[in-house]
């Protein structure tokens, strides 16, 4: 059974929320974020077009609508550009294969370490059968 984060974990979380982002890091982060989001949208568009091309009965329409609704909810949960959570967002995107660490090249080591740590945490949660929130 998973335990709640202890005081040390909360200190780390507080530190992450207050990371300082330089102008150059903000530009790198924005570019990587937009790149991953664009890939996500292209995948949704591709699948929606495939589904639309195969519509033969009314239930197929609702399947498409359901897919689009769920895709939007997932994207809205995942893609959050607030700097206070951005390292977690990037960690999740790397863990899910939607972004590579190379695409974050130029971020400070403090941010990269936070991103790696979160990706690693998500991996451990998956190993024990827990599904992290947000996707």
Where do the language-model regions lie?
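Acidic, Ser/Pro/Thr-rich low-complexity regulatory regions
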Residues: 2-135
């Amino acid at each position: 059974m998973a335990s709640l984060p202890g005081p040390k974990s909360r200190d780390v979380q507080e530190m992450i929320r207050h990371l300082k982002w330089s102008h150059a890091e903000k530009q790198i982060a924005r570019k990587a974020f937009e790149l991953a989001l664009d890939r996500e949208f292209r995948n949704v568009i591709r699948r929606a077009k495939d589904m639309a091309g195969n519509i033969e009965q009314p239930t197929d329409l609702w399947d498409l609508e359901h897919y689009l609704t769920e895709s939007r909810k997932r994207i809205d949960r995942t893609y959050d550009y607030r700097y206070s959570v951005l390292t977690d967002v990037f960690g999740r995107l790397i863990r899910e294969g939607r972004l590579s660490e190379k695409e974050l090249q130029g971020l400070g080591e403090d941010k990269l370490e936070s991103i790696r740590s979160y990706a690693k945490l998500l991996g451990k949660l998956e190993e024990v059968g827990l599904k992290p929130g947000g996707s």
